[in-house]
From Swiss-Prot:
Name of the protein this chain belongs to: Chaperonin GroEL 1
Primary localisation category: cytoplasm
Family as reported in the entry's similarity comment: Belongs to the chaperonin (HSP60) family.
Gene3D superfamilies, per database record: GroEL, GroEL-like equatorial domain, TCP-1-like chaperonin intermediate domain
Subunit structure: Forms a cylinder of 14 subunits composed of two heptameric rings stacked back-to-back. Interacts with the co-chaperonin GroES.
A cellular component term, taken from the record's GO annotations: cytoplasm
Superkingdom assignment: Bacteria
Ligand binding (ATP): 30-33, 51, 87-91, 415, 494
Biological classification of the source: Bacteria, Pseudomonadati, Thermodesulfobacteriota, Syntrophia, Syntrophales
Gene expressing this chain: groEL1
PROSITE patterns in UniProt: CHAPERONINS_CPN60
Entry GO MF terms: ATP binding; ATP-dependent protein folding chaperone; isomerase activity; unfolded protein binding
NCBIfam families assigned: GroEL (TIGR02348), PRK00013.1 (NF000592), PRK12849.1 (NF009487), PRK12850.1 (NF009488), PRK12851.1 (NF009489)
Length: 544
């Protein structure tokens, strides 16, 4: 076992602080409408230019192991906020840095980190309760456009396309983002269905860079049991191989000999195929398989119905125009099922929704209905160069997540105003004396996002914060126009869910780091002495 190096107390916290600062200082320059770009070198191809906080955070790895621990913890804040709310990564990083920085000062002055943590936790909970009071539900297309625009770094085109997509497929509909062939960013609405099951083996992927399976005009085999023996599949596979078209198997599971044979055939190119597990469980799985069958014009192969796997023909299989599978999701686009059958199924599900008494069943039935009716909206992102394309696509994906979050939990004034408006409630909070410093840490931290937005726009953050604090309601600083405005009226809004997760995740990690008393890392290896100079002995008389 390699020797370990251990650091304690303030020495450990100082090392962590250095790592946190290194990462946060690189990320926070991207915040706000006047946020700067960060250029990231890539081992292959050209550099990436981005204004996305989580992209910057993911690239940072520090040489010092103790500093790197701090940086990685804050990177986790950005990454988790992105996964849960889709946006707010830079805000979360700034809040984590502010809470930890103020906390380390107080811990160094002799205060108990556990008391600080208790004070921080209680204060954060109060801020979240206040945010919920300030929050306002989204009612119209204009507000959806505004949220999308802000999250896409003030790109109004993206905001409008997202709101149009949501209007077309509904708030529960599926929206995907793809790269366009030209320079225009466009929206396509396609009938389709998405379910939360990915490929059973990564050897099925057709695009190794994105780890995705994309198929055109595939046959779709739907089976309600497990497939492990190849013998049952051989007759239908031979028919499909002769047709030259790809194939998708949707079954309870695919394993053993059957999976191995399909993978080998796929790699060799004999038969392009993929397999996914059937969505849902029990009776719901059977119902969802039937939904897919109706959408694709196929049949569910079920021994209960007297149909055996080794006796089916191509007419029993479903088809669709396009199939898109990731490790988590499968999207069937433009199924070949008849419109009359689909409408009949929709009517049946609607009747079940009306009759059910269980909220859970109703929710699941509505999900199935959305999959059958909603269709898929495809946003095709266009740009002049590949570098710009990747950056723009990342912004569209961020904006899409943020817009969904806004529809879910409502919106608050943006530009850091919502957090600032929780200060009066924090000031009136009653805490024990040993926990009050934790409250003061949060009071200082909630000002930080607005300070940074102002600083990135070339203004003195403290002056802007004081001016906004003097006023009430939605009054705030528009860094884009450099004016003080009503943030809601100006369309500068944040999804409540994004602000909430940013603060919760930041406080959680910063509190953990504050209460860290020891850090252990592998000791750096001592380099051995180099080879001595000079000529080896007995070689002086060699001729050259």
């Amino acid at each position: 076992m390699a020797a370990k190096e251990i650091k304690y107390d303030s020495v450990a916290r100082d090392k962590v602080m250095k790592g946190v600062d290194t990462l946060a200082n690189a990320v926070k320059v991207t915040l706000g409408p006047r946020g700067r770009n960060v250029v990231i070198e890539k081992a292959w191809g050209g550099p990436t230019i981005t204004k996305d906080g989580v992209t910057v955070a993911k690239e940072i790895e520090l040489e010092d192991k103790f500093e790197n621990m701090g940086a990685q913890m804050v990177r986790e804040v950005a990454s988790k906020t992105s996964d849960m709310a889709g946006d707010g990564t830079t805000t979360a990083t700034i809040l984590a840095q502010a809470i930890y920085r103020e906390g380390t000062k107080l811990a160094a002055a002799g205060m108990n980190p556990m008391s600080l943590k208790r004070g921080i936790d209680k204060s954060v909970q109060l801020v979240i309760d206040e945010l919920k009071k300030i929050s306002k539900d989204i009612r119209d297309k204009k507000e959806i456009t505004q949220v999308g625009t802000i999250s896409a770094n003030n790109d109004n085109t993206i905001g409008e396309i997202i709101s149009e997509a949501m209007e077309k497929v509904g708030k529960e509909g599926v929206i995907t983002v793809e790269e366009a062939k030209g320079m225009e960013t466009t929206l396509e609405i396609v009938e389709g269905m998405q379910f939360d099951r990915g490929y059973v083996s990564p050897y099925f992927v057709t695009d190794p860079e994105k780890m995705e399976v994309v198929m055109e005009d595939p046959y779709i085999l739907l089976y309600d049991k497990k497939i492990s023996v190849m013998q049952d599949l051989v007759p239908i596979l031979e028919q499909i191989a002769r047709s030259g078209r790809p194939m998708l198997i949707v079954s309870e599971d695919l394993e053993g000999e059957a999976l191995a044979t399909l993978v080998v055939n796929n790699i060799r190119g004999t038969l392009k195929c993929a397999a996914v597990k059937a969505p849902g469980f029990g009776d719901r799985r059977k119902a969802m398989l039937e939904d897919i069958a109706i959408l694709t014009g196929g049949k569910v192969v079920s021994e209960e119905l007297g149909i055996k796997l080794d006796s089916i023909t191509l007419t029993d299989l479903g088809t669709c125009k396009r199939l898109h599978i990731t490790k988590d999701n499968t999207t069937i686009v433009d199924g070949a099922g008849s419109q009359a059958d689909i409408e009949g199924r929709v009517k049946q599900i609607r009747t079940q929704i009306e009759e059910t008494t269980s909220d859970y069943d109703r929710e699941k039935l509505q999900e199935r209905l959305a999959k059958l009716v909603g269709g898929v909206a495809v946003i095709k992102v266009g740009a002049a160069t590949e570098i710009e394309m990747k950056e723009k696509k990342a912004r569209v994906e961020d904006a899409l997540h943020a817009t969904r979050a806004a529809v879910e939990e409502g919106i608050v004034p943006g530009g850091g105003v919502a957090l600032l408006r929780t200060l009066p409630a924090l000031a009136g909070m009653d805490l024990p004396d040993d926990e009050r410093p934790g409250l003061n840490i949060v009071k200082r931290a909630v000002e930080e996002p607005m300070r940074q937005i102002a600083a990135n726009a070339g203004f003195e953050g403290s002056i802007v914060v004081e001016k906004v604090k003097e006023n009430t309601g939605n009054f705030g600083f528009n860094a884009d126009t450099e004016k003080y405005v009503d943030m809601m009226e100006a369309g500068i809004i944040d999804p409540t869910k994004v602000v909430r997760f940013a603060l919760q995740n930041a406080a959680s990690v910063a509190s953990l780091l504050l209460t860290t008393e020891a850090m252990i890392a592998e000791a750096p290896k001592k380099k051995g002495a180099g080879m001595p100079g000079g000529m080896p002995p007995d070689m002086g008389d060699m001729e050259y």
